[in-house]
Amino acid sequence: MARPNVTVIIDDQSFVIPGTESGGLHRAGFISDNALIPNLGTTAERNSGIMTIGSMGDWYGRLSSLDPIQSGLSAGYGGNHSSYGGTGARWPGGPTGAWEGEWWTVHNYLQYGGVAVVGSTGEEESTVGALDALSNKQVALDSVVAMSSARTGLTLGGVLVGAKYYSVVGDIANVNTVVNARLDCIGVYPHKEGETLNDSWTDAAASTSITPNEYAIAVYGAKRFLGTSNDADNDVKELNCAPDVAGCLARTDRESEYWFSPAGFKRGDILDSMRLVYNPTDAEQDEMYAQKINPVVTFPGEGTVLFGDKTLAAATSTLSRINVSRLFIYLKKIVGSAARSLLFEMNDEDTRNAFVNSIEPLLERIKGRRGVYDYKVVCDESNNPGSIVDVNQFVADVFIKPTKSINFIRITFTNVNTSVDLG
C-alpha cells in the first residue's frame, strides 16, 4: 500500500479567446439542425428554441462552464443537457460532434462584434422549429447566415491537418425560407453548396436554392484558420466566408451607417485568415461579379477583403447593391413602425400632416448622414381622394434617391509638353 500522500491536479479547461471587434448591435440569425441549443443552451433557451450570444466570451464560455440544468438562469452556459451526455459535460478541447461546424460558423461571425441569434429545429422541450422561430418578426434580425453543418477531413500535401466545414442544400434552403418569409433582413450565402465549392473557380452560377432578389447576397470564398488555442492539435479549420461577410455588415452598422457598403478596405476586412482556399484571378472576379457573386480576395501586402457589394436583384435596379437594399430595409422598419401609430386615427388632413412631419426629419437625418441624395413625401388629397378615404385607407408616397456606392474608378494621366499652360 502506498504511503499517505496528496495529489494536486491542474485541469486546464480555459480558452484563450481570439482578438475580436466589439460593441455592435447587428443581429444575425443562424438556423441549427444539429442540436446547438440542446448542447450549449440554458434551460430557458432550450424551452424557447432561441439562443442569443452577445460576445465571443459567451460563446467560448458555453464550451467550458457547467450546465445549470434546471435553473436556466444567469449561470446557464455550456455542458450537455443530461439527455445529451450527462450533467456538466464540457468540451475543453473545442467543439465536437454533429454541431461542430455550426459552432465555428457562429464563431467566425462573432469575431466582428455582432449579436448571434441561433434558432433550433424542434429540439429539446421547444415545440417551435427554427424556421418558424426565426421567421417570426418579433425576433429582430438584420441578417440570416447559412450554416456550414457538414464536416470532412482537411488534407494538405497528403497529410490530414484539420477539418473542412461546408454548407449543404438544406443549410441554404433554410436561410432562403426565413429571409423570404420576413423580407426585412439580408440572407448571406456561400454562392453554392458542397465540399469542393471553393477549391477552384469552375462555376459562377449561384445555388438554385437561393431566390434571386434584393434580400440575398452570394459570396465566393473560403478561408483557413486555426482552431481553439488550448486544442492540443491546434489543427487547421476551413470554412466559407459567409459568416465573415455578415460580420462585415455588423462592422458597417457599428462604425458607419446601415446604408454604407460593407465591401472594400475600410469595412470589408476579413479577420483571422491564414489564407484563402483559392484566390480568384482578375478574370474570374469579373465573371463572378457579372453573375452577382461577391468574391473575397487577398491583395498581397494589403489584406483579405470582401470585394463586391451586389445583391441578387435584377442588374437594372439600384437595389442590386447591398447598401441601397439595406437602406430600404431600414426605411421599411422605421417608417412602418411610425405608420402603425396612425391606425384607427381620424383620416383627415391633420393626420396626414402629422405623418409627413414625423417622416421628413428622419429622411433629412439620413440625407445628412449620406444615405440619400434627395427625397420627397407626398401625403395629401392628391393621393388620398374621397374614394380612398371612404374605404378606410391612408396612402403615403415616399420618393427616394439613394446614395450609390463606387464600383468603378477611372483616373487618366495625360502627358503634356513643357510649354503647355496647366493653369
List each language-model region with its residue ranges:
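Structured, hydrophobic secondary-structure cores that serve as assembly/anchoring elements
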Residues: 1-118, 139-423
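A short, well-structured beta->alpha microelement
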Residues: 118-136
